[in-house]
């Protein structure tokens, strides 16, 4: 295996989900407006998917976030500042911590492999999180600099083309079944699912690990 591409958030760095949507929903509810939580959360997710799966013109994540908040504010006639609220909520992303084994494993793998990060994120977010945690790799690819999102094939093929690699020479490691397993698998990459919660299941991945140490102790041994 010549190269290993890692997803960033949920794979190398800790992440929480769902808080932003509920905060915006609360902002609306605080104006005395009744909001159906299930419907709101479903549409919150579908808006992101529609703007990342090639159904719309490319937008950086921050712009998607602002537009999504503004859409809900307009619908419910809330006089909120979508850009300000988006930046407030996104500020937490800059503080994400690396998993305990991340730096050690990456440093070890870089001795014998090309190590890249391939993440659905904006450049400034990933750059700051990497700097905060002292993480370095050979190259970093984001949805912002590739102008597309996982799991679209263009995301992965651009990385291959940029490095003169064939799909069978690359291992993709990540926690998302759709983005990090089905996406790269579709173009012929080997895949490793990081199942930190031990939930189990087989979705076409070649390997399953519970933390990054499993790459050194098992997958690449």
Where in the sequence are the language-model features?
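N-terminal helical cap/lid subdomain that shapes the substrate entry/recognition surface
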Residues: 2-100
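Asp-based, Mg2+/Mn2+-dependent phosphohydrolase catalytic module
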Residues: 1-4, 14, 80, 103, ...
